Amino acid sequence: MTEFDLSTREGRWKHFGSVDPIEGTKPTTKNEMTDLQSTHKNFLFEIEEVGIKNLIYPVNIDRFQTAGRFSFSTSLNKDEKGINMSRILESVEKHYNNGLELNFDTLYQVLRTLQTNMKQNSSGVDVSGKWFFDRFSPVTNIKAVGNADVTYGLAIEQDQITRKEITIEATVTTLCPCSKEISEYSAHNQRGVVTVKVYLDKNNQVVDDYKDKILDAMEANASSILYPILKRPDEKRVTERAYENPRFVEDLIRLIAADLVEFDWIDGFDIECRNEESIHQHDAFAKLKYRK
């Protein structure tokens, strides 16, 4: 058995099974290598979407940096075997070097760059991340950082937007109207998870504070908002407000819809509320879809 010098890293590697590279016969320079993806012939079908998922990249959402989880895709013509996926990362990196602000204008520019690099007519992106914002306690006005999950979706054909949407998931308090009605005192309440997917007007700019307006519709119609910091006067206010505003899941999604339908920059929306029931082992949920 061969003895290796265990005092060196290379010796230890070989001791644990590493071997020297073989003398290869295939090209080692890019220009000499076969580019299978660029093969052109009849491959039977055009592909609507091909790309990458679960790409994690730093992004800025308003004042805070967070981790964005991206899904990118482009079309693929029938006479092309595949796409060059490394060009997707190159397109993202180009815009990251300029500071990757997570908004529709930036995503549009990334997709246009992607189309050029990939030589394709259509492209799309979905990216999700934590949206952080200031949240003040209701009585003592103490500032802390709240958060919600946001997902942007954008797709373009040539230079025209074909899909423009944003999804926000936030947590609220819901107090049971039935429990309040039948009980001598108190009522059970729980955390509700509200998800709103908004289909935005593709042909016009949305208002600057669209995320805040959507989140306000989700939270203000609940029994109570959730706060990072609550002192005793705040807790009293939150508890009493919830009791004054009981909500079934059905109530909540209808009230949210009534607010959203008034915005002229919204073409439609999907709403779901899921209550993590405090007196059951199951959850309660309700869904609603609306298109103008």
Swiss-Prot record:
Signal peptide: none annotated. Belongs to the GTP cyclohydrolase IV family. It comes from Staphylococcus haemolyticus (strain JCSC1435). The record marks C176 as: May be catalytically important. Its EC number is 3.5.4.16. It catalyses: GTP + H2O = 7,8-dihydroneopterin 3'-triphosphate + formate + H(+). Converts GTP to 7,8-dihydroneopterin triphosphate. It holds the Pfam family GCHY-1. GO terms for molecular function: GTP cyclohydrolase I activity. GO terms for biological process: tetrahydrofolate biosynthetic process. It comes from the Bacteria. Keywords: Hydrolase. The gene is folE2. It is an enzyme of class 3 (hydrolase). Pathway: Cofactor biosynthesis; 7,8-dihydroneopterin triphosphate biosynthesis; 7,8-dihydroneopterin triphosphate from GTP: step 1/1. This is GTP cyclohydrolase FolE2. PANTHER family: GTP CYCLOHYDROLASE MPTA. The lineage of its organism: Bacteria, Bacillati, Bacillota, Bacilli, Bacillales.
